[in-house]
Amino acid sequence: MSETRAVLRGVRLSVDKGRLVADLIRGKKVDQALNILAFTQKKAAVIVKKVLESAIANAEHNDGADIDDLKVKTIFVEQGTTLKRFTARAKGRGNRISKPTCHIYVTVGN
């Protein structure tokens, strides 16, 4: 069977926080990975779980894959654009606030 991908771009999440969760499920079987993500208490876990479920649905619908045989082949989190915002400070000054985004790529296969 070929590999099937799912991509989520522009997620309002830091790359480092996303990679912490991605490292937990890399190389695992999909049912085990979903179980790990369900019990991981991080914002990134909810987002990565949605992308993984999308990749599983893509594999089942597009390739006719059996879910029991699938495992997470690759998962990586790359840096997206950074939203730059302004916050007011004392004496008429201002400081920049950086709001990072990331892109999440998940590939499942046998």
Swiss-Prot record:
One of its GO terms (biological process) is translation. This is Large ribosomal subunit protein uL22. PANTHER family: CHLOROPLAST 50S RIBOSOMAL PROTEIN L22-RELATED, LARGE RIBOSOMAL SUBUNIT PROTEIN UL22M. InterPro entries: Ribosomal_uL22 (IPR001063), Ribosomal_uL22_bac/chlpt-type (IPR005727), Ribosomal_uL22_bac/org-type (IPR047867), Ribosomal_uL22_CS (IPR018260), Ribosomal_uL22_sf (IPR036394). It holds the Pfam family Ribosomal_L22. HAMAP family: Ribosomal_uL22_B. The keyword Cell division does not apply. Coiled coil: none annotated. NCBIfam families: rplV_bact (TIGR01044). This protein binds specifically to 23S rRNA; its binding is stimulated by other ribosomal proteins, e.g. L4, L17, and L20. It is important during the early stages of 50S assembly. It makes multiple contacts with different domains of the 23S rRNA in the assembled 50S subunit and ribosome. The globular domain of the protein is located near the polypeptide exit tunnel on the outside of the subunit, while an extended beta-hairpin is found that lines the wall of the exit tunnel in the center of the 70S ribosome. One of its GO terms (cellular component) is cytosolic large ribosomal subunit. GO terms for molecular function: rRNA binding; structural constituent of ribosome. It comes from Acidovorax ebreus (strain TPSY). Part of the 50S ribosomal subunit.
